[in-house]
Structure formats: structure tokens, C-alpha cells
């Protein structure tokens, strides 16, 4: 019945009541405390076994550390062995090198000793050979002297042996340098292919580069510095030459009579500033050389030497005087300063030459003058005058030119006739030059020729006076 009731009347379902939050928290804490107590109990029960495990773990760690240390020690030992082996190898190599260097030094010392001994032996042999040669030479000289004494005792003539046939053949075959013979200087110097005959005695003294100025020193820079020529002028250079002339010429005149004094104004190095002094005799020139050589002037030491120049017409550039030299500053003939008052003008015309040279050149000059035209003859007559002052000659020439220009229209016929008479008659200067040249000959020939020349001179003077009278008479008409 009860089962039937249960089946027919089911039991009413009940749902649990949800606890509150506070209860829930309390139950949770309780559960946690329970679990903690259980854990502590379990740990308390297993406490002894845990200590044993810890001991075994510690022992295992110690064993592991010991193994690691042992392996590290073995590794370090192996590394030390490698380093030691390497060091031993390096030490062995170093030792071998030191031994090799020591052996090489010993070998070098041995070779040097052998070379020194060989050199000493050669020097001894050379010294012995020299002594032997010297002894042989002395014996030969002594033998020659003994032979010479014997020859003298036997009254036989003795002389020095003849030189070899080919001795100085090249020097003899070489031609003389024309520039050195004419100017006493050559631009090639010792490198010249021609022969320079240096005189042992001469009346002309040469002092190289004695006269120097700023313009002459700066001449080399003209090609590279065209403005350098603005710092000096020819007037300043000539004024410096005049001061130099007045300063040094009295010193040269104190030694002897100076018949020529020239200063070169060339710009070439071998002629620049050269001073030429010609004395009347070679003895005076030698005295001047011994006096002035090595002296100091303007901060420079003088270098004096004998000069072969005696004919100044050949040495001085004639085109330079008329400012028509085509070579300019590269000319190898003398470009000289003009002496004040035209001093030593006689030497410029080679009047001071010896009688032999003048006599030998007189025939050639006379033949040449006979072939000269009126124009050349007129200027040669002007050069042959005795007037020592060139200014006076220039003045007279200027006056004659003015007179000729004033009478050019009306007096042309008379001038041509007078010029022909002058051309046919001997000139005054030529007669004087001829009488001076031939005055050193014998007295009879000199007196005879002086009479003939005086008569011709009187005739030429009479003709010139008559020509001057005609000019003075007709000059008022021309005016």
C-alpha cells in the first residue's frame, strides 16, 4: 500500500538553499585550514625521509662539482703543457738563431782579419816596390850624374835629351783663338777648341770684372724681368764710370806711363767690366801686375793678368761707336766707355805701335788709300789730323758743313774741283803720319823724305788757303 502510495503520490522535491556570501567565505577558510593541517601532518610523517633525500642530493652535487673541477684542472694542465711546449720550441729556435748569428759574426771577423792581413801584405809589397823603384831611380840618376861628370871631365858637350816626337802635337796643330788674340778673353774659356797663347810678358794689363754696376749685374734678368731696366739708366752707368775713371786711373799712372785705358761695357760674362791698361813698356806692366794683383777694390779681389791686346782697332767694335752693332749685348768684341775728354785717343788709332809694325803696315795702308774714293779719303784725312781734341775737330767739321750747306746751290762746281784737287794731292794728316812713322829710320833717308814732305805740305796748305779765300770772298754774295 505504501508502495502504491509512493507510486501514485510522488514525493515533493526540495532544493538546497543557497548560502550567503559570509557563510561561503567561512566554509572556504575552514576547508583551507583543513588542507593545511593535512599537509603538515603528511610532512611531519615524512620528515625523516626528506632529510635523507636532501643529504643524498647534496652529496651528488659535491661529487658533480669535484668531477667538474677535475676536468677543469686537466684542461688547464693540458693548456700549460701546450704553452710549455711552444715556449720550449721558441727558446730552441732563438738559441739556434743566436748560435747562427754568433757563427756568422765569427766568420765575418775571421774574413775581416784575413782581408786586413792581405791588405797589410799588399801595402808592404807596394811599399817595398816603391822603395825598390825609388832606389832604382836614385841609382839611375846617380849613374847619369856620374856619367855627366865623366863626360865633363872628358870635355864632351852635354845637353838635355830631346822630347818625344809626338809631344804636344795636338797643341801645335790647334789654331789660335781669334777672339782671345784680339780681345784677351774668350767666352768658352778653358773649354775653347782653339789655342789660347797666354803671354808671359806684355805691355797690356787685364783686370777682369773690376768695374761693376747695378745695371751690369742685372743684365741677366732682363730676359725674365723686363721691369729691371727701369731701375737704372745709361746716364747713371756712365756717371759711375766717370767716378771709377777718376778713382783708379791715378793709381795706374803711379806705376808708369799709361798710353791706353779702356773699360768694357759688354754684357757678356767674359767681357763684363774688364779693365785694360796699356803701359809704355813691359817692365812697367810687370810692376803693375805685381802691385795690383791680389789687392782689394770695392769689396772684390783683383785678378790681374797679361793681355795680348796691343792693336785696339782690332779689339774695339767700330760699329758700337756709331750705335749700329748688329750683335748688341752678345757681341764678342769690346764695347768700351768713352774716356772723358777723349783721353788716350792716340792709342785708339794704334799710333803707339813699334816702328817695325808701323813700317810693315804702312805699305799696305798706302796702297789701300790710293784705291779709296773721295768720301773714304776725306774721312781718313780727318782721322789723320794731329788735333788731340775731338771736340775741336767736330766743331770744325760742323762749321764746314754749315758753310757747304749755305753755298750748296752756287758753289757745287768749285767744290767738286777742290775735292778732286784734294784727292790728287797728299793730305796733311797722311804726310804727318808718314813723317812720324819714317822718322825712326836712318838719318839720311829721314832728312830727304822730310824735305819732300815739307814741300808737298806747303803745296797742300797753299791750295787749302786759296780755297778758303775763295769761300770767304763769295760768302757775302751767297748771303
Swiss-Prot record:
One GO term of the biological process aspect: mRNA splicing, via spliceosome
Enumerate the UniProt keywords alphabetically.
Isopeptide bond, Metal-binding, Nucleus, Phosphoprotein, Repeat, Ribonucleoprotein, RNA-binding, Ubl conjugation, Zinc, Zinc-finger
Q: Which InterPro entries match?
A: Nucleotide-bd_a/b_plait_sf, RBD_domain_sf, RRM_dom, RRM_dom_euk, U2AF_small, Znf_CCCH
Name the residue ranges with Basic and acidic residues bias: 365-379, 388-403
**One MF term in the entry's GO annotations:** zinc ion binding
Q: Where is the RRM domain?
A: 203-309
Q: Where are the zinc fingers (C3H1-type)?
A: 171-199, 311-338
User: What SUPFAM superfamilies is this protein classified in?
Assistant: RNA-binding domain, RBD
Q: Which GO terms describe its cellular component?
A: spliceosomal complex; U2AF complex
The family database entries (Gene3D superfamilies) matched by this protein are listed as:
3.30.70.330
Q: Basic residues bias: where? A: 20-37, 404-417, 442-451
Give the top-rank taxon of the lineage listed in the UniProt record for this protein: Eukaryota
For region Disordered, the annotated ranges are 1-63, 356-479
Positions bearing Phosphoserine: 354, 389
From start to end residue, where is composition biased (Acidic residues)?
50-63
As for subcellular location, the record says: Nucleus
Sites of the Glycyl lysine isopeptide (Lys-Gly) (interchain with G-Cter in SUMO2) crosslink: 67
Q: What is this protein called?
A: U2 small nuclear ribonucleoprotein auxiliary factor 35 kDa subunit-related protein 1
The species is: Homo sapiens (Human)
Amino acid at each position: 500500500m505504501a508502495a502504491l502510495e509512493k507510486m501514485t503520490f510522488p514525493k515533493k522535491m526540495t532544493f538546497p538553499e543557497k548560502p550567503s556570501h559570509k557563510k561561503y567565505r567561512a566554509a572556504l577558510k575552514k576547508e583551507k585550514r583543513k588542507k593545511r593541517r593535512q599537509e603538515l601532518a603528511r610532512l611531519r610523517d615524512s620528515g625523516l625521509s626528506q632529510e635523507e633525500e636532501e643529504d643524498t642530493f647534496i652529496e651528488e652535487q659535491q661529487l658533480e662539482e669535484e668531477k667538474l673541477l677535475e676536468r677543469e684542472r686537466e684542461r688547464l694542465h693540458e693548456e700549460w703543457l701546450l704553452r710549455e711546449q711552444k715556449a720550449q720550441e721558441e727558446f730552441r729556435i732563438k738559441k739556434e738563431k743566436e748560435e747562427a748569428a754568433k757563427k756568422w759574426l765569427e766568420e765575418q771577423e775571421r774574413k775581416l782579419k784575413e782581408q786586413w792581413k792581405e791588405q797589410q801584405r799588399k801595402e808592404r809589397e807596394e811599399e817595398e816596390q816603391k822603395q825598390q823603384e825609388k832606389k832604382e831611380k836614385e841609382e839611375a840618376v846617380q849613374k847619369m850624374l856620374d856619367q855627366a861628370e865623366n863626360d865633363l871631365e872628358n870635355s864632351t858637350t852635354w845637353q838635355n835629351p830631346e822630347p818625344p816626337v809626338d809631344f804636344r802635337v795636338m797643341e801645335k796643330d790647334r789654331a789660335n783663338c781669334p777672339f782671345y788674340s784680339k780681345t784677351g778673353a774668350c767666352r768658352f774659356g778653358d773649354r775653347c777648341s782653339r789655342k789660347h797663347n797666354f803671354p808671359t810678358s806684355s805691355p797690356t794689363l787685364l783686370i777682369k770684372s773690376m768695374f761693376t754696376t747695378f745695371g751690369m749685374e742685372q743684365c741677366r734678368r732682363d730676359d725674365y724681368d723686363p721691369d729691371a731696366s727701369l731701375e737704372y739708366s745709361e746716364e747713371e752707368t756712365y756717371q759711375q764710370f766717370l767716378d771709377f775713371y777718376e778713382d783708379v786711373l791715378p793709381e795706374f799712372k803711379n806705376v808708369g806711363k799709361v798710353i791706353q785705358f779702356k773699360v768694357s761695357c759688354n754684357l757678356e760674362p767674359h767681357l763684363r767690366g774688364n779693365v785694360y791698361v796699356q803701359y809704355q813698356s813691359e817692365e812697367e806692366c810687370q810692376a803693375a801686375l805685381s802691385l795690383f794683383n791680389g789687392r782689394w777694390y770695392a769689396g772684390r779681389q783683383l785678378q790681374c793678368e797679361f793681355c795680348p791686346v796691343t792693336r785696339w782697332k782690332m779689339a774695339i767694335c767700330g760699329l758700337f761707336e756709331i750705335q749700329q752693332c748688329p750683335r748688341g749685348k752678345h757681341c764678342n768684341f769690346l764695347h768700351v766707355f768713352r774716356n772723358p775728354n777723349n783721353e788716350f785717343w792716340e792709342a785708339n788709332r794704334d799710333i803707339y805701335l813699334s816702328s817695325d809694325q808701323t813700317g810693315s803696315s804702312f805699305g799696305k795702308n798706302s796702297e789701300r788709300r790710293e784705291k779709296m774714293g773721295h768720301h773714304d779719303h776725306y774721312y781718313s784725312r780727318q782721322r789723320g789730323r794731329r788735333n788731340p781734341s775731338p771736340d775741336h775737330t767736330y766743331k770744325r767739321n760742323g762749321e764746314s758743313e754749315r758753310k757747304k750747306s749755305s753755298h750748296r746751290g752756287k758753289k757745287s762746281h768749285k767744290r767738286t774741283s777742290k775735292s778732286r784737287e784734294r784727292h790728287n794731292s797728299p793730305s796733311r794728316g797722311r804726310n804727318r803720319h808718314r813723317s812720324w812713322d819714317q822718322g825712326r829710320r836712318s838719318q839720311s833717308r829721314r832728312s830727304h823724305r822730310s824735305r819732300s814732305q815739307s814741300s808737298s805740305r806747303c803745296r797742300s796748305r797753299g791750295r787749302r788757303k786759296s780755297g778758303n779765300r775763295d769761300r770767304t770772298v763769295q760768302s757775302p754774295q751767297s748771303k
